[in-house]
Amino acid sequence: MKKVSFVFLVVALNSVVLGENDPFEEINRTTLKINKTLDAVIATPVATLYQKVTPDFIEVGIYNVISNVDDINISLNNILQGKIKEGLSDIARFTVNSTLGLGGFIDVASKMGLQKHNEDFGQTLGFWGVPHGPYIMLPGLGPSSLRDTVGMIPDAFLSPRILLNHEPTIYSLKFLDLIDTRARYLGLESIVIGDEYLFIKDAYYQNREFDTLDGEVEDDFDNWDDF
């Protein structure tokens, strides 16, 4: 019980520390309210309907297709971080899934032992020591930082979607990506503890640190096993 209490204490303290780099908090809180309204009125109903009418194997397949397209961008960012082996593995994943996996609908590559990675240009900047900068709540998109927001620009140009040269298709894929993502996170609102704004901000930074360090985050609780 003491260990659990300590965990929540650390989360609370982290929120206070992160608040020091939040000069746009007033605007961010307003944006969060707008995002919650948009989510309640549009995103959640559409995602709920999508989840109800879409068979599980189709839903998984759609996720796989979107994930497969992202492997090109992931590969380039791995290479930019000097992780050549991982970058080549991402290219192999894309090739295998695009051919044997029917355009990525079936994740054949994972079954072959080709691990799925998670990289973007924001993480690449972080890898090379660029700090997050101010916390930003983006309208319609959610939590971000100045660094990660800037990173979205090259990520957009590195995505194979722009090669389609057909705006309706590009926007349809993006919309489907957003709805599929929202559907997979339905119900998570119940885990929010305390001030929702601070909770989301802290969770965002913790998640980005985990991603940037490839999961190799120092465990602060190794010395608390006796609690």
Where are these regions (language model features)?
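Helix-loop segments that flank and shape redox-cofactor active sites
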Residues: L49-T54, N77-G87
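Mid-length scaffold segments of soluble, non-membrane domains
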Residues: N68, Q81-P143
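A structured, mid-to-C-terminal "fold-capping" secondary-structure block
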Residues: D22, Q123, W128-F227
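Sec-dependent N-terminal signal peptides
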Residues: V4-N14
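Boundary at the C-terminal end of the N-terminal hydrophobic targeting segment
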Residues: V17-N21
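N-terminal, post-signal-peptide region of Sec/Tat-exported proteins
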Residues: A40-N73
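Cationic, glycine-rich low-complexity segments
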Residues: P23, R29-P45, L49
